Amino acid sequence: MENENKILIIRVIRSFEYRTIKNLILKDIDLNTNVSDFKKLVADKIQTTPGFTPFKTKQYDSMKIFFVPHGQKPNNLTINIENDHFFLNNNKSLAENGVVYETEISFFVMEDYLKYKENPENKW
């Protein structure tokens, strides 16, 4: 049987407008993990991983698939705003949400996302 532990790339988004994004690489993640538990794990990693100091002040609450390997990358470099069906459901496992090996997942504040989606303009 195939090993269910995978590497995932988490794109922690502090600011949509300024494209303040930092990748967090997580290894040996069980894809059968519930999304709400996974969010807690990622939030803990942000608090304890060196280099994430500017990202520690936000209360990240949402996850959305940015890119699935061998799939099409979105046009927007900050977040996938075209496909709202890519949001991860808290009540399902990562695998049930379509997460596979080396999937890139955006982790962000929903309120900031909704503002950005109304006017997806970059300030810089």
Curated annotation (Swiss-Prot):
Superkingdom of this protein's organism: Eukaryota
InterPro entries for this protein: UPF0538
Pfam families listed in its UniProt record: DUF2340
Family stated for the protein in its record: Belongs to the UPF0538 family.
Name assigned to this protein: UPF0538 protein
Organism in which the protein naturally occurs: Dictyostelium discoideum
